[in-house]
């Protein structure tokens, strides 16, 4: 919410989220609850981590670059590696390449010890 406020936009202005998506039960559950709470169940989201693996310290920057590229190109790829919806996660990632139309996207990063960040990326 803080990153949306700092960008002077609302959740309805965001066309997709590139979620941190660690593929661990607890982290994915918390992130899914957060996505649903802020953006609603219909938010388009994916995690690009399935394409790159966890790049540790480079993850946030790499995911932000993918987010900017997707926003520029007008489409997001399917979430690679997604197999089955966890009943405790209230939102579902996209499972096929999806066209997007909007000016803003969000990339999230969740780190060990509770260091969490999100960045709003705007399309020119």
Question: Could you say what each language-model-derived stretch is?
Answer:
Residues 1-124:
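Conserved "HGTGT" condensation-loop signature of ketosynthase/thiolase-family condensing enzymes
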């Amino acid at each position: 919410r803080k990153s949306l406020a700092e960008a002077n936009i609302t959740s309805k202005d965001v066309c997709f989220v590139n979620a941190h998506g660690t593929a661990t039960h607890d982290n994915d559950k918390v992130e899914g609850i957060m996505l649903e709470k802020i953006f609603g169940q219909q938010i388009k989201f994916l995690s690009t981590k399935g394409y790159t693996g966890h790049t540790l310290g480079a993850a946030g920057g790499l995911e932000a670059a993918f987010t900017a590229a997707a926003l520029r190109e007008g489409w997001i790829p399917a979430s690679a590696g997604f197999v089955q919806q966890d009943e405790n996660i209230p939102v579902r990632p996209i499972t096929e390449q999806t066209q997007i139309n909007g000016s803003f996207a969000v990339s999230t990063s969740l780190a060990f010890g509770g260091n969490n960040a999100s960045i709003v990326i705007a399309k020119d």
